[in-house]
């Protein structure tokens, strides 16, 4: 039995965690196929997963996740305090250490601190990027489609790592998409940013991260409010008859 299954069944957990409720055994009689058995077991395991996080928090009052993962929220209001050089260096190192397809590391970054340029970049989309007007630092994330066909995944991972590192430093962040978006005049957002910053055409503008000191904190999402129903075990559940596609 795999370790994660043991953990959700109540075996092999760390000290101080109380026992989960009794795992309901699966009916493996001859009239049940292997797939049905796996689905039944998966349903019971999912019930355990849904309650595990809440039970652990009630027991210890401390999140089991890394604090930055547990507490990170998108922040759109910042105070006008510049980041230190050390903070910026740590953020960039986090981005450079992100996983990369075939270890190519083709993602590039442009740091923007000039207020006038941040104001202009805030109009790269019809809506949803105005928070760039008040942020002390913007990081433009660039991908290289010619060098790496998985550039979108690489750029996404780099941006996510920077956001988590920002949270770990007590900073706030928010992601503003550029790739696949448009300005209010119908121009591609990536083209708009490219023209402003002189970005060569072999690079693609993926997003801009707003990084700064938070004007206020947002509370972490309660564990029970997470969409645990999006998790499935072994295979996707069968559709209900009402959900069956029309022929």
Pin down the residues of each PLM region.
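Acidic, surface-exposed loops and disordered segments
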Residues: 16, 23-247
